[in-house]
From Swiss-Prot:
Compartment(s) of residence: Cell membrane
EC number(s) given by UniProt: 7.1.2.2
One term under GO cellular component: plasma membrane
Binding site for ATP: G153, G154, A155, G156, V157, G158, K159, T160
Protein's name in the database: ATP synthase subunit beta
Species: Oenococcus oeni (strain ATCC BAA-331 / PSU-1)
Gene: atpD
Organism placement in taxonomy: Bacteria, Bacillati, Bacillota, Bacilli, Lactobacillales
SMART domains xrefs: AAA (SM00382)
Major localisation: membrane
Reactions catalysed, as given in the entry: ATP + H2O + 4 H(+)(in) = ADP + phosphate + 5 H(+)(out)
Any Pfam family hit: ATP-synt_ab
A molecular function (GO) term: ATP binding
Subunit relationships: F-type ATPases have 2 components, CF(1) - the catalytic core - and CF(0) - the membrane proton channel. CF(1) has five subunits: alpha(3), beta(3), gamma(1), delta(1), epsilon(1). CF(0) has three main subunits: a(1), b(2) and c(9-12). The alpha and beta chains form an alternating ring which encloses part of the gamma chain. CF(1) is attached to CF(0) by a central stalk formed by the gamma and epsilon chains, while a peripheral stalk is formed by the delta and b chains.
Residues annotated as signal peptide: none
InterPro entries for this protein: AAA+_ATPase, ATP-synt_VA_C, ATP_synth_F1_bsu, ATPase_a/bsu_AS, ATPase_alpha/beta_chains, ATPase_F1/V1/A1_a/bsu_N, ATPase_F1/V1/A1_a/bsu_N_sf, ATPase_F1/V1/A1_a/bsu_nucl-bd
Length: 466
């Protein structure tokens, strides 16, 4: 193995000098810096600067590094443990356990985090819908098993709560394996999620990988690949159906932007790295289903300043089968989950996949909500009295639909005191069909807010009247 020395340290960037007569390490190779206290720092090769110098990104703090320290080339990219040994554990970007448990034995298989995407002839597509128990998702933007879904939203509109509810609903009803990857998010949320999953019994079928907000950009940029490598092994070696949760894919882009600037690359639009589309493609193309098994991916996507044209969310859009857009104006109306039913999309919402009845009800719901949106200007200026009888009916039913798209979440029960509701897709379709048909025009609008099934809305109406 080649041995070099630290030439200079600029924050998380470390330049390493190798002897002229030695082969330089390859791009993406992991190098180990020997610290004075005997510990090792892992750094990853990014650029060959010439004159036997390589520029690297540190995966941990570079505090205490000095010029002249020894650096060893491992001869391979970062390798992380895979397989059954990862279940029930929490790892960092290097695949080291951070949950206080036993170290992973050396006998456990390890795979490099940098790998090629599956070949075209290995891919498989599915038309099976994944039931989530969340009405607005199951009705209007159904998720495909083996598909990729994005939860888009600005700050504080409920992306993490929604992804936690999806983990609660799908992971508990799903007998397969789940991999949760926390990319640049709050450590407190990761800690809470670990203990909640432990208490609910889901943890034993879950591997968790965290690279949180306080970590250097190198760790945040690579932690997504660590989680994905673990998910790929369950898919390829064991033929499992894997659920891959990523919170938050924007932080992956953000970390890449930080690293790009530190490496001296000229930024592109809005200050992002010029390699944004390439980096996103390399990650997203590996999240796919093959003939051996499937990876169903649900990714939270932060939208900076609620601007969907920002290059980071705009680049992510292109890779997804379904999008769930969270809207701030709905949170202001107290409608949770604050999913925008008109902006959210899914390639699975076709009669061939969801069935004629479901498709008919979903398109009618969207039609009513769209008409209501168009009539809102007239209502705000002239009032309801200026509408025709038909328009008044549309508005009244659309408001009931809007409230009925909300529901209480199990993961929010400790804050709201309202038990969470899992609503089967048949009950969801039936409930909205009854509202569209006018069966519940006599019930107060408030009865439809924050309930599960249509029967619960009827029950709530009786309580409101009494």
């Amino acid at each position: 193995m080649a041995e070099g020395t630290v030439l200079q340290v600029i924050g998380p960037i470390v330049d390493v000098q190798f002897p002229d007569n030695k082969k330089l390490p390859d791009i993406n190779n992991a190098l180990k810096v020997q610290r004075i206290d005997g510990s090792e720092l892992t750094i990853e090769v990014s650029i060959d600067l010439g004159d036997s110098v390589v520029r690297t990104i540190a995966m941990d703090s570079t505090d205490g590094l000095t010029r002249g320290m020894k650096v060893l080339d491992t001869g391979a990219p970062i390798e992380v443990p895979v397989g059954e040994a990862t279940l029930g554990r929490v790892f960092n970007v290097l695949g080291e356990p951070v949950d206080g448990g036993d170290p992973i034995p050396n006998s456990v298989d390890r795979h490099p985090i940098h790998r090629s995407a599956p070949k075209y002839d290995e891919l498989a597509t599915s038309t099976e819908v994944l039931e989530t128990g969340i009405k607005v998702i199951d009705l209007l933007e159904p998720y495909l098993r083996g598909g990729k879904t994005g939860l888009f939203g600005g700050a504080g509109v409920g992306k993490t709560v929604l992804i936690q509810e999806l983990i609660h609903n799908i992971a508990q009803g799903h007998n397969g394996i789940s991999v949760f990857t926390g990319v640049g998010e709050r450590t407190r949320e990761g800690n809470d999620m670990y203990y909640e999953m432990k208490a609910s019994g889901v943890l034993k079928n879950t591997a968790m990988v965290y690279g949180q907000m306080n970590e250097p950009p190198g760790a945040r940029m690579r932690v997504g690949l660590t989680g994905l490598t673990m998910a790929e092994d369950f898919r390829d070696q064991e033929g499992k159906d894997v659920l891959l949760f990523i919170d938050n894919i924007f932080r992956f882009t953000q970390a890449g932007s930080e690293v790009s600037a530190l490496l001296g690359r000229i930024p592109s639009a809005v200050g992002y790295q010029p390699t944004l589309a390439t980096e996103m493609g390399q990650l997203q193309e590996r999240i796919t289903s093959t003939k051996k098994g499937s990876v169903t991916s649900i990714q939270a996507v932060y939208v900076p300043a609620d601007d969907y044209t920002d290059p980071a969310p705009a680049t992510t859009f292109a890779h997804l089968d379904a999008t769930t857009n969270l809207e701030r104006s709905l949170t202001q109306q107290g409608i949770y989950p604050a999913v925008d039913p008109l902006e959210s999309t899914s390639s699975a919402l076709t009669p061939d996949i969801v069935g004629e009845d479901h498709y008919e009800v979903a398109t009618q719901v969207q039609h009513f909500l769209q008409r209501y949106k168009e009539l809102q200007d007239i209502i705000s200026i002239l009032g309801m009295d200026e509408l025709s009888d038909e328009e008044k009916t549309i508005v009244n039913r659309a408001r009931r639909i809007q409230f009925f798209l909300s529901q209480p979440f199990s993961v929010a029960e400790q804050f709201t005191g309202v038990p969470g509701q899992y609503v089967p897709v048949e009950d969801t379709v039936r409930g909205f069909k009854e509202i569209l048909d006018g069966k519940h025009d006599d019930l107060p609008e408030e009865a439809f807010r924050n309930v599960g099934t249509i029967e619960q809305a009827v029950e709530k109406a009786k309580k409101l009247e009494s």
